[in-house]
Amino acid sequence: MIDFNRPALVGKELNYIQDAVAQGMLCGDGKYTKLCSEWMKKRFEVNQVFLTTSCTHALEMAAFLSDIQPGDEVIMPSYTFVSTADAFVLRGAKIVFVDIRPDTMNIDENLIEQAITDKTRAIVPVHYAGVACEMNRIMEIAQKYNLKVVEDAAQGVDAYYHGKALGTIGDFGCYSFHETKNFTMGEGGALVFQKNEYQEKAEVLREKGTDRSKFFRGQVDKYRWIDYGSSYLPSEMNAAYLYAQLEECDKINRKRHQVYDGYHERLADLEAQGKLDRPFVPDGCAHNAHMYYIKVKDLATRTRLIAYLRENGIAPAFHYVPLHSSPAGEKFGRFCGEDVYTTKESERLLRLPMFYDLSMDDVDYIAEKIHQFEF
């Protein structure tokens, strides 16, 4: 069976984990946490990086730092992972779902303004598949209405919008380093932002509401509980694994783009014949080859294709069930306007195997089997 995803060792992961153990500090915020943070600051040209235990927790931190209060409204697409909404629901917010663009599967920037009310406090664009939302327009809207922008860049690490790293354009950006992502620490994430005014509060929030970070810098003689907080700091072993992956960022990118381009070239004729749609990347967007998906005629065709590929030793995967159609989505949110594309396009989409060690022979085989399928 060709797996859908397989985490890879690409560099010095095991050596760095051994070194982390030898350092005698495994609890986090040590050598490798700092190395990861400094690497991202330099690579993505961002002032503040806080490594976290997940992108979910990075989103929760962003919701806290955005001062979301009970009854506030937060705008986002329904086609996203539950964590995007959960982080704000935990603060008592009402989620307002907006339809997506069928070409990128991202939030339709032209529908955001009509969803704004006097209760709206934030917009959460989700950069699906590492392809940027139209951030210039979204930032214009946010500035016009004095709204926070929290970028869900879980899939967008080392992807860019007009030269700017995704996650660094809005007020806050949230990354994922889950094992399914381009760069992994097993479970983990990061919160990034440009405004240094949020640094101290973010430190306290990540360290259980204490000034423990100041204590370790020698700025206070003991640390105390001073505000809201939780435990959002990953261990040094996780950070060590991630740092080895970040060091090989360009190597990982080259291989993933090779796989992505391989699919794209081999399936072009099927798109020309009207049998499927391939991913679309707008001008100004530099994607990171996080995933490769195709879109077929309808749900019935996708269901048949999934069964067919599995019979032939290939593990594809569909993706999100739109949040507004779920029980919690109905309870905690509402859909603004008409669901023209969210449900329809989500039912057409199928993700193909994509990981660092996927061979081009496997790409050839997968493309061949898709060609043999009776659309």
Task: Annotate each PLM feature.
Residues 151-185, 214-216, 221-226:
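Conserved active-site segment immediately N-terminal to the catalytic lysine
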Residues 26-73, 87-91, 97-99, 164:
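Phosphate-binding glycine-rich loop
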Residues 1-27, 224-226, 353:
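N-terminal "arm"/small-domain region of PLP-dependent enzymes with the aminotransferase-like
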Residues 58, 80, 353:
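Conserved SAM-binding loop
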